[in-house]
């Protein structure tokens, strides 16, 4: 899977796809003993710092594309929620709610007919994206890390 950024999505329509070791797409199936929501996993996979890890290890291609092959994604440090810790459960649930809200906002944006209406939704989406980054940063202890301060090369 070649991309210029992370693009992990939740499939609401159970679309069937194929994929081998390097794409074109992957699917995640939640194991029975996994308590984390797939929306939570989606959020963490899309988190900018996790994507920097993928990019730092991946094969690079023309046009700033890089591989999201299984070998670069399978061992990512997905933060496991301690479901005995009420603070972590609260953050998990906020992340899930924020992802669901983002999905709704993006659908509403796509339904809009005028540029000003679309721009309004873009601003709302940006607010929710920032909130999501903050929540995930808190879990990883990275509240003081900023994307622009880290060298992506």
Predicted regions and their residues:
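Non-catalytic DNA-recognition/assembly elements of restriction-modification systems
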Residues: 78-153
């Amino acid at each position: 899977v070649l991309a210029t950024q992370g693009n992990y999505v939740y499939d609401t329509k159970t679309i069937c796809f194929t994929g081998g070791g390097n794409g074109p797409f992957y699917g995640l199936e939640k194991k029975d003993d996994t308590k984390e929501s797939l929306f939570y996993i989606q959020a963490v996979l899309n988190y900018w710092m996790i994507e920097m890890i993928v990019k730092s290890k991946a094969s690079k291609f023309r046009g700033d594309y890089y591989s999201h092959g299984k070998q670069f994604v399978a061992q990512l440090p997905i933060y496991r929620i301690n479901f005995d810790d009420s603070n972590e459960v609260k953050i998990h649930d906020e992340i899930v709610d924020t992802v669901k809200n983002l999905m709704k906002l993006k659908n509403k944006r796509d339904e809009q007919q005028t540029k000003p209406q679309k721009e309004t939704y873009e601003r709302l989406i940006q607010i929710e994206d920032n909130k999501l980054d903050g929540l995930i940063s808190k879990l990883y202890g990275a509240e003081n890390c900023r994307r622009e301060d880290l060298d992506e090369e």
